Structure formats: structure tokens, C-alpha cells
Regions:
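N-terminal mitochondrial targeting presequence
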Residues: 1-71
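Catalytic strand-loop segment that frames the active site of acyl-thioester-processing enzymes
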Residues: 58-140, 254-340, 353, 488-501
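A cross-kingdom feature marking solvent-exposed beta-strand/loop segments within repeated
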Residues: 167-182, 187-190, 215-217, 336, ...
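C-terminal, well-structured subdomains that either form a transmembrane helix-short loop-helix hairpin
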Residues: 334, 342, 347, 351, ...
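Intrinsic-disorder/low-complexity, polar/charged segments enriched in Ser/Thr/Lys/Arg/Asp/Glu/Gln
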Residues: 110-117, 143, 188-190, 204, ...
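The feature marks the first
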Residues: 112-118, 126-130, 136, 141-168, ...
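HotDog/MaoC-like acyl-thioester-processing domains
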Residues: 42, 46-94, 181-186, 196-288, ...
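Active-site helix/loop of acyl-thioester processing domains in fatty-acid/polyketide metabolism
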Residues: 139-164, 335, 339-361
Length: 501
């Protein structure tokens, strides 16, 4: 089977294959949640191993299908009862399904051995498309976050097989939209990925989103996916733990077998070395001389602003908060903690609200910057989220981008792209929203930080009759958030340049 610009369907079309596969999936066990969906995976054989179940199919249409029940490795009552029994014996369970790693033998795995994918045929299935549409008729990205994280988890377990450690999402290193895919009803999506780097007990997983105008064959390899159809890239880091000792677990080594696989491996290796070095340093890097002058200029300028206007809005006034009780329907495959994709979705929805209210328009998601899950979120805990606009950047016609008009309207780090399919292909405003999350267990009055999510959105100038606003920090803490936001915008711009060349 050959691929050109689109993935062509085999004889009989995707419709019959799709219906047959969907019926087959309904009988599989889904250890992530009890919600079935219509996604496909590359594995077709039956297995009693939880990792072989189509867990990545459990997150689609969660809100629409939460009244349906599918077979599951363990109900919440089963997991709750077992945990109580183990606690009486002085034992702590990390996972209900993964209680024995089966083997500690380490071998080599190729990228092809962990390759997995999901099909989201929006063009062929209008009701599936309806579950992924937002109020503006565009892609509801929060739904996609759940699928990305669940697929990454499936890939992690395929790489570790036959061992069965407890794999958890340690960080989301970046999710970036490369192209606009506004009319998703005209496309069939494929989410596909594999392990791209391994350490001793950690692994990086790269997932890409592809958009095709034609129907998609239910079977293909990674090499057959055309790069020109990529609209999204995502990188996750997973870590493995031994369910018996609760310590790190040595995983299979990745063996790159092609030039491109070695390039991806070295890139990931360099990034992880940089991330480890940054973790040893202070969480906040001191401002440079240029940034110090910027902070001083912002402080002076903010003193003269007595009230906000349509073009100037205080950072403190951009805050949105949300508090959620963590219910077991959104638990991960291990039963006792909340699924990371659900957290990404909830944080995104709040960030979207903040960006939409700030711009009085429908923002378009551009990127999720590096995010580390500092603490897992237990089922039965209270999750508090606070979102605020931390940085804005105005992209104007190139001839007007060379000078800073104020400390709050600096020379942008990004440039208007000549590619009409790119998000930043026209004048507009880049809005960065920071979402801080904290968790509180009911048996204590103290809360602890769970993670910080940084989402970037773009609002075209053409979507608003008046100029889009700049965010105004007033306190030193807010100004440092602004400075860090500008650093992140520059980092994203550099990353886009790297992958474009």
C-alpha cells in the first residue's frame, strides 16, 4: 500500500471496516474509564493484559457517553475495597491492575514495535465530529488532549512489554499546532506515535496529528504517513515505577534503526539533558539586564495607568478560577489517580475562558508549553485551578513590527508566516494563559501544587473591530510572570524555526 498526499482506503471503503472495528472495540476492556468510543488501534489480537486493551479509546465523547457502561478491569468499588483491604495489612497500592511487573529483564525495542495510532474520521462520521466541535465550529482541542495522553500511555506499555510496570505521565514537553484545520468536518484525522527516546526508567513519546481529505485505511505503518499532512506535534515523558517496591523501574532500551530515528533520538536526548540541568537550578531564572530594564519600564508605565480600557487590561482582572471534585469516572488505568488527559482538558477549558474573555473573541489554540505534573491528583480530592493572562504579543504587518511602542507592546518574538495555513499568517495577538493547579485531600486542610499549564492562543486582528488588548502587570510577581511569558514565546518561536528548517 502506497501513500501520496492522502491515505487512500482499501477496497470496501472505510465505512464497512470502521463499523466492524467499532463493534469489536465495544467488547474490549478499557482500564482508563468506563466510557467507550470509536477510536482504532493497531493491535487486533485479544489479550488479558490490561496494557493490550484499547485504553486510548476510552476518552472520546466522555461527556456525551457517560451513561454507557463497558467491561472494565475493575470497577471503582472493586478498587476501593481492595485498597482498604491492603491498608489493613499495612500495604499501599499504586495500582489495582498492575501489581506485579512480571519480569525485570531489559531488552531492546525498535520504534516500530511501540507504534500505535487512532483514527478520528470526522468527515466520515458526523456524530463523532459533533463531539469534537467547539462553539465556533472549529476543533475542540480539549477533547483531543485526552486522546493524545491516552494514546501516549498505550505506546508506553507496548514499549515496556512483556514487563508491566506502573507507567505515569511525568510531563508534557510540548503540544504545538502547525497548521489551521478549521473545518474539521472536511477531514479524517489520524493520531499516531511511538517511543522516540529512552532513559533508564523514563521514555519520551512523540505523537503527531495528521489530517486527510480522503478516507483512511485502518492499517498502515509510521513510514507511510506523509509529513505534509501533519497539523500537530506532541511530546510526552513517561516514567516507570515498580509496583512492588514503589521505586523506578528499568525499561527496555530504544534501538533507532534509521537516520530520522537517530535524529529524533539525539534531539530528545539533548532536550532531556537540558531539562535535568534546569531542574537543578532555581525554578525562577533571574532576569537579565535587558529584562530588568523592562521590569522597571513596566513599573513606571503601570503607575500612570489608572483604569483599564479596551486596549489595556490589568493582569489581576484576567483571572478565572475553577474548583472540581475528582470523581472516579475520570480515573486512570491504575484506578486511584485521575487521568492526566482529563486534567489537561480541564486546564485548557479554563485557559480558553480566560483568553476568550480577555480578547472578546474566539481564540485559536497554538501551543501548550512544557508542563510537569508535580503531584498526582487522587480520586476523591479537590482540584483548584486559577488561570490568568500572563503575556500578550501583537503581530502587525512586518514593517510595523520593528519598534516597541510601549513596555506592553514590545517587538514580537514571533513573525507573521508566509504560509497561509499557519496560525500566525496574519496580524493578530498572541495570548499566553497560565493555569496554576492545586490539590487538597479531604483528610487535611493543606493543599499542594499539582502542576502549572501554559497555553498560548492566537486571535486574528480581523476578528475584532477594535485593537486587541495588552495585559498590564502591576506587582513584581506579575511582572516576572510577564518576563517568563516572553521567554516562553521566544522559545516556541525558536522551536518552530527548528522544525521548519
Amino acid at each position: 500500500m502506497m501513500f501520496t498526499k492522502t491515505l487512500m482506503h482499501k477496497s470496501g471503503g472505510i465505512s464497512r471496516a470502521w463499523t466492524k472495528k467499532t463493534m469489536a472495540l465495544s467488547s474490549l476492556r478499557c482500564p482508563t474509564t468506563n466510557i467507550p468510543s470509536r477510536c482504532l488501534s493497531t493491535e487486533h489480537h485479544e489479550s488479558t493484559v490490561p496494557a493490550a486493551a484499547a485504553d486510548a479509546t476510552a476518552t472520546v465523547n466522555a461527556d456525551q457517553r457517560d451513561n454507557q457502561v463497558s467491561p472494565q478491569t475493575a470497577t471503582w468499588l472493586d478498587a476501593l475495597t481492595e485498597r482498604a483491604r491492603q491498608l489493613k495489612d499495612g500495604k499501599t497500592l499504586d495500582s489495582y491492575s498492575y501489581i506485579n511487573p512480571k519480569t525485570t529483564k531489559v531488552s531492546e525495542r525498535t520504534r516500530a514495535e511501540s507504534f500505535s495510532y487512532l483514527l478520528l474520521p470526522f468527515k466520515d462520521d458526523k456524530w463523532l465530529c459533533d463531539a469534537y466541535i467547539n462553539a465556533f465550529g472549529r476543533l475542540r482541542v480539549g477533547q483531543l488532549f485526552q486522546d493524545l495522553d491516552a494514546l501516549a500511555g498505550r505506546i508506553a506499555y507496548k514499549h515496556c512489554a512483556p514487563a508491566e510496570p506502573v507507567n505515569v505521565t511525568a510531563s508534557v514537553d510540548r503540544i504545538l499546532m502547525l497548521k489551521k484545520v478549521d473545518e474539521i468536518q472536511n477531514y479524517n484525522f489520524v493520531l499516531a506515535g511511538a517511543v522516540s527516546w529512552t532513559g533508564r526508567s523514563s521514555m519520551e513519546i512523540t505523537v503527531k496529528g495528521y489530517a486527510f481529505e480522503d478516507s483512511v485505511s485502518p492499517e498502515f505503518s509510521e513510514d507511510e504517513l506523509p509529513l505534509e499532512n501533519v497539523f500537530l506535534t506532541a511530546n510526552f515523558t513517561f516514567v516507570a515505577r515498580n509496583p512492588l517496591t514503589h521505586r523506578s523501574f528499568a525499561i527496555n532500551r530504544l534501538l533507532p534503526v534509521s537516520e530520522q530515528e537517530w535524529i529524533d533520538y539525539r534531539r530528545a536526548e539533548s532536550y532531556n539533558a537540558k531539562k535535568k540541568l534546569a531542574a537543578k537550578n532555581s525554578s525562577v531564572i533571574e532576569p537579565s539586564d535587558e529584562e530588568t530594564r523592562l521590569v522597571h519600564d513596566m513599573w513606571k508605565a503601570s503607575k500612570s495607568i489608572e483604569a483599564t480600557s479596551s486596549e489595556l487590561k490589568f493582569m489581576k482582572d484576567s483571572k478565572f478560577t475553577s474548583t472540581l471534585f475528582m470523581q472516579p469516572q475520570y480515573r486512570n488505568r491504575h484506578s486511584y489517580m485521575i487521568f492526566g488527559g482529563y486534567l489537561l482538558r480541564q486546564a485548557f477549558e479554563l485557559a480558553y475562558c480566560a483568553a476568550a474573555a480577555f480578547t472578546s473573541a474566539g481564540p485559536r489554540f497554538v501551543s501548550l508549553d512544557s508542563t510537569t505534573f508535580k503531584a498526582p491528583v487522587p480520586v476523591g480530592s479537590v482540584l483548584s485551578m486559577e488561570a490568568s493572562v500572563s503575556y500578550t504579543e501583537h503581530l502587525k504587518d512586518n514593517e510595523h513590527n520593528s519598534k516597541a511602542t510601549s513596555p506592553f507592546d514590545l517587538v514580537p518574538t514571533n513573525k507573521i508566516s508566509t504560509n497561509p495555513d499557519a496560525f500566525l499568517s496574519e496580524p493578530g495577538t498572541l495570548v499566553q494563559v497560565k493555569v496554576d493547579t492545586r490539590i487538597q485531600n479531604l483528610d487535611t486542610s493543606e493543599s499542594k501544587e499539582s502542576g502549572c499549564f501554559i497555553y498560548s492562543f492566537f486571535v486574528p486582528a480581523s476578528s475584532s473591530k477594535s485593537p486587541l488588548a495588552s495585559v498590564i502587570p502591576q506587582t513584581y510577581s506579575e511582572m516576572m510572570d510577564y518576563v517568563e511569558g516572553r521567554r516562553r514565546a521566544q522559545d516556541t518561536a525558536n522551536y518552530v524555526d527548528t522544525i521548519s528548517n
